[in-house]
Curated annotation (Swiss-Prot):
Binding site for [4Fe-4S] cluster: 359, 420, 423
Membership in a protein family: Belongs to the aconitase/IPM isomerase family.
UniProt-listed Pfam families: Aconitase, Aconitase_C
Name of the featured protein: 3-isopropylmalate dehydratase
Reactions performed catalytically: (2R,3S)-3-isopropylmalate = (2S)-2-isopropylmalate
Molecular function via GO: 3-isopropylmalate dehydratase activity; 4 iron, 4 sulfur cluster binding; metal ion binding
Protein species of origin: Schizosaccharomyces pombe (strain 972 / ATCC 24843) (Fission yeast)
Gene that specifies this protein: leu2
One cellular component term from this protein's GO annotations in UniProt: 3-isopropylmalate dehydratase complex
Function: Catalyzes the isomerization between 2-isopropylmalate and 3-isopropylmalate, via the formation of 2-isopropylmaleate.
Top class in the EC scheme: lyase
Taxonomy, superkingdom: Eukaryota
C-alpha cells in the first residue's frame, strides 16, 4: 500500500491547521491565538466578565493594548493628565477604564504618555508584534490589516475578547478559501487603495462573505508592506473574514530588527519557516476572482457603501437604470443622503474637509505620497479643514524628521497627534451635518464621520489632490509630483526610529482614578468584587411574537447602532438607540414611518431583513442594541460573518434563509402575522406555514442550554497546555518572552520612564 500524500494546501489552510488545539465533530475548532491587540472601546465589558468570574488573563505577554478610537488628536504638549485632557465624559470613561483594567490584569500598554501609542493596526506591525504565520485578533474588524504579513488576523467581538484573554484560544469554524489574483502591473499613479476599492466594486460588500481572501498576482507582489496592509485592511469591506498575502522578501525585510521581532537564531529559524507559507501548487479554492491591474483607475466612492465606487472620470449612477428594486432603492437613498444627482460627474462637487489618516492610510508611505502632491501648493479656499493624522507617535516623529509636517503645515493642513480621528465620529474630529469629505479611511456609511456627514473614500494622493483643488479630482493631473508609489519628494529616509530612545511625555497611568463614570453618570468600580462564576447567556428554546419587516440590504453595524452610542462600559441600555439615524429625526423625535416606531412592531422579537445584514464593524454593540430592544431572532438571506458570530455570544439566533422564503416572511411580517421560532426543532412557523432551518450543532447546544463558552473551553485546559508546550518547542520565536525587545507594562508609580520609544 503506497503512503498517503498530503493534499495541497492554501496559505490559509497552513496557518489554520498549525493552530488547531481541538476539532469537534461538527467542525468547530478551538484555535490558538498568538497575538491579541486591545483598545478602549471593545474591552471594558470583557475585563468586567473576567473580574465577575474570578478569572485571570492566561498570557498577559501576548496582549498589547493602546488607546486610539476615543482620544482627541489635539497637541499633547500641555497635557497634564487623561482626566482633564479628554473632555468628552463617555470617551474619558472608556480610556480610564482601560487604564485601570491594564493595571489590574498586568498587560502591556502604550498610553497617551508613550510615543509608541497609535492606532492598533499601525503599532502592531510597527513594533514587530505582528509576525508571519501567526494568529492575531482584536476587537476591531480591521484586524484583517495584519494579514498582509501572512498572518491569520481577524476581528472579534467583546465576548471573544474575554474568551481570548481567559484561554488564549477562540472557538471558530473554518472559512472558505477565496483567491483574488491581480494580473499585471498597476498603472502609473494607482495606489493599493484604488485597487482594493476597485475590487470591492467588482465583487460587492458581500463578495467575500464566509471566506478568507488570499490576494496574489504580479501587482500584489509588487506592493510595499504598507500598501499590502491597506489591501488587507479593507478585505473586511469586501465581506471577508480576513485577507492574507503570502510573506516574501519584502515582508522579511520589513519585520527584521523590529523591537518584538525574533533575533539571532530565532530569526533564522523563523524565516526558514515563513518561506514555507505559500499556497501549494494545485491548492483548491472555493472561489476565484481574476482582476486585471490595467483596468484600475483612480477610484472614489460616491455612495454610502464601500461597493459604491466609480473611477474618478466616471458619472454617478442612475437608479432608474437598475432593474433590482432593492438595489435601486438603495442607490436612491444613497444619492439623497450624499446630496448627489444621477448622471453627473463626481468631480463637479466641492468638498468641505479632507482627512488623511486611519488604519488604512496613516503610515509613513501614505504621508510621503500625500506630501508629494501638496508640496509648494496651498489648500483651496473652500476647504474648511484638511487634517493629517499620523497612525502612531512614531510615524509622526518619522514624518517630522523628514520634514513632511512642514510641507503640510505650509500648505494649510492641520498636523495632528496619533489616533483614529475622523475615521469614525467617536472623538472630537467629526464632520458637521452635510459636510462633504475626501477621506482615506475605510467606511463611508451614513453618519460614520459625523451625523449627516458625507464621506468619499480615496487614496492619500487623491485626498491631497482634492484638498488642493477644492473638489475630487484625478491625481494624474499632478503627474511630475507623484508616480506609482514613488513621490518626487526628498525625504530623510535614513531616519531609523529604532535608534530613537527619547522618553515619554511624563504621564503615569496612576493619574487615572480607581473609579470611572459611565455616560449615564453611574460610578463603576472597575476593580470591584469577584463572584464565583460567569453568568453565561440566556437559554434559547422557543421565541414567539411579532416580526418586524426591514426590507433593506447591507444594513451595516453603524446603522444598527451609530458610533456616538458605543462609548459605554456596559452591555445594556442600547436598545433605545438602535437604528437611531433612521428611527429619529434631527430633534430626537420618532419618525412615524419607521417600522420599530409603529405598533405592534415596537414589541417585535423577530426581525426580517435582506442580504448582508450586519456588515461593518466587529463591535458587539450592534447585537447588544438589538437584544436590548427585544429582538432575539434575525432572519435574512445572508449575514456578515462577525455580526453573525456575535449574535450567538449574546443568546440571539441569526437564521440564514433562502431569499424566496425571506420575501414570503417579509410579506407575512408586513401583515402582522405572528412568528414562532423553535430552536430545538429548528422550525420557523408563521401563519399556516412552517419552514425548517439549519444551525451548527455546537452553537445550538450552547444556546439551548445557555452555556458559557469560556467555561467549556477551560475544561480543555490540558489540551491547551499540551499545544503550548509543542508550540514552544517547534516555534520558539512566537513566544514574546524570548524577545530581546523591552515591553513596558503599565507603570504603577508616578515616575515616568526615560527610554520607552522604539
Amino acid at each position: 500500500m503506497s503512503p498517503s500524500v498530503a493534499s495541497p494546501k492554501t496559505l490559509y489552510d497552513k496557518v489554520w491547521d498549525s493552530h488547531v488545539v481541538d476539532l469537534q465533530e461538527d467542525g468547530t475548532c478551538l484555535l490558538y491565538i498568538d497575538r491579541h491587540l486591545i483598545h478602549e472601546v471593545t474591552s471594558p465589558q470583557a475585563f468586567e466578565g473576567l473580574r465577575t468570574a474570578g478569572r485571570k488573563v492566561r498570557h498577559p505577554e501576548l496582549a498589547l493594548a493602546t488607546v486610539d478610537h476615543n482620544i482627541p488628536t489635539d497637541p499633547r504638549k500641555d497635557m497634564k493628565d487623561i482626566a482633564s485632557f479628554i473632555h468628552q465624559p463617555d470617551s474619558r470613561t472608556q480610556v480610564l477604564a482601560l487604564e485601570n483594567n491594564i493595571k489590574e490584569f498586568g498587560l502591556t500598554y502604550y498610553g497617551m504618555n508613550d510615543r509608541r501609542q497609535g492606532i492598533v493596526h499601525v503599532i502592531g506591525p510597527e513594533q514587530g508584534f505582528t509576525l508571519p504565520g501567526t494568529t492575531l485578533v482584536c476587537g476591531d474588524s480591521h484586524t484583517s490589516t495584519h494579514g498582509a504579513f501572512g498572518a491569520l488576523a481577524f476581528g472579534i467581538g467583546t465576548s471573544e475578547v474575554e474568551h481570548v484573554l481567559a484561554t488564549q484560544t477562540i472557538l471558530q469554524r473554518k472559512s472558505k478559501n477565496m483567491r483574488i489574483r491581480v494580473n499585471g502591473k498597476l498603472p502609473e499613479g494607482i495606489a493599493s487603495k484604488d485597487l482594493i476599492l476597485h475590487i470591492i466594486g467588482v465583487i460587492g460588500t458581500a463578495g467575500g462573505t464566509g471566506s478568507v481572501i488570499e490576494f496574489c498576482g504580479e501587482a500584489i507582489e509588487g506592493l510595499s508592506m504598507e500598501a499590502r496592509m491597506s489591501m488587507c485592511n479593507m478585505s473586511i469591506e469586501a465581506g471577508a473574514r480576513a485577507g492574507m498575502i503570502a510573506p516574501d522578501a519584502t515582508t522579511f525585510e520589513y519585520v527584521k530588527n523590529r523591537p518584538l521581532a525574533p533575533k539571532g537564531d530565532d530569526w533564522e529559524q523563523a524565516v526558514a519557516y515563513w518561506k514555507t507559507l505559500r499556497s501549494d501548487e494545485n491548492a483548491k479554492y472555493d472561489i476565484e476572482v481574476e482582476i486585471n491591474a490595467a483596468d484600475v483607475l483612480p477610484t472614489v466612492t460616491w455612495g454610502t457603501s464601500p461597493q459604491d465606487v466609480i473611477p474618478i472620470n466616471g458619472n454617478i449612477p442612475d437608479p432608474a437604470h437598475v432593474k433590482d428594486n432593492v438595489r435601486a432603492a438603495s442607490i436612491q437613498r444613497s444619492l439623497e443622503y450624499m446630496g448627489l444627482k444621477p448622471n453627473t460627474s463626481i468631480v463637479s462637487y466641492p468638498i468641505d474637509k479632507v482627512f488623511i489618516g486611519s488604519c488604512t492610510n496613516s503610515r509613513i508611505e501614505d504621508l510621503r505620497l500625500a506630501a508629494a502632491v501638496v508640496k509648494g501648493r496651498k489648500v483651496a479656499a473652500n476647504v474648511k479643514d484638511a487634517m493629517i493624522v499620523p497612525g502612531s507617535g512614531l510615524v509622526k516623529k518619522m514624518a517630522e524628521a523628514e520634514g513632511l509636517d512642514q510641507i503640510f503645515i505650509e500648505a494649510g493642513f492641520d498636523w495632528r497627534e496619533a489616533g483614529c480621528s475622523m475615521c469614525l465620529g467617536m472623538n472630537p474630529d467629526q464632520l458637521k451635518p452635510y459636510e462633504r469629505c475626501a477621506s482615506t479611511s475605510n467606511r463611508n456609511f451614513e453618519g460614520r464621520q459625523g451625523a449627516k456627514g458625507r464621506t468619499h473614500l480615496v487614496s492619500p494622493a487623491m485626498a491631497a489632490a482634492a484638498a488642493i483643488k477644492g473638489h475630487l479630482c484625478n491625481v494624474r493631473e499632478f503627474f511630475g509630483d507623484v508616480s506609482n508609489g514613488s513621490p518626487s519628494i526628498i525625504t530623510n529616509k535614513n531616519y531609523d526610529p529604532s535608534h530613537d530612545v527619547e522618553g515619554d511625555i511624563g504621564l503615569s497611568v496612576d493619574d487615572a482614578t480607581d473609579a470611572v463614570t459611565d455616560a449615564d453618570g453611574i460610578a463603576t468600580n472597575v476593580a470591584g468584587s469577584v463572584s464565583s462564576g460567569s453568568a453565561g447567556i440566556p437559554k434559547f428554546t422557543v421565541v414567539e411574537g411579532i416580526a418586524a419587516p426591514l426590507p433593506m440590504a447591507n444594513v451595516d453595524t453603524d446603522k444598527i447602532i451609530p458610533k456616538q452610542f458605543l462609548k459605554t462600559i456596559k452591555r445594556t441600555g442600547l436598545g433605545q438607540f438602535a437604528f437611531y439615524e433612521i428611527r429619529y429625526d434631527a430633534d430626537g423625535k420618532e419618525i412615524p414611518d419607521f417600522v420599530l416606531n409603529r405598533e405592534p412592531y415596537r414589541h417585535a422579537t423577530v426581525l426580517v431583513a435582506h442580504d448582508n445584514f450586519g456588515c461593518g464593524s466587529s463591535r458587539e454593540h450592534a447585537p447588544w442594541a438589538l437584544n436590548d430592544f427585544g429582538i432575539r431572532v434575525i432572519i435574512a438571506p445572508s449575514f456578515a460573518d462577525i455580526f453573525f458570530n456575535n449574535c450567538f455570544k449574546n443568546g440571539m439566533l441569526p437564521i440564514p434563509t433562502p431569499i424566496e422564503q425571506v420575501n414570503d416572511m417579509m410579506k407575512a411580517a408586513e401583515n402582522q402575522v405572528k412568528f414562532s421560532v423553535d430552536l430545538v426543532n429548528q422550525t420557523i412557523t408563521y401563519g399556516d406555514k412552517q419552514v425548517k432551518f439549519d444551525v451548527e450543532p455546537f452553537r445550538k447546544h450552547c444556546l439551548v442550554n445557555g452555556l458559557d463558552d469560556i467555561g467549556l473551553t477551560l475544561q480543555k485546559e490540558t489540551m491547551i497546555d499540551a499545544f503550548e508546550a509543542a508550540r514552544e518547542e517547534n516555534f520558539p520565536w512566537m513566544n514574546i518572552k524570548r524577545s530581546r525587545a523591552r515591553l513596558s507594562p503599565v507603570k504603577s508609580n508616578k515616575q515616568s520612564s526615560s527610554r520607552n520609544d522604539w
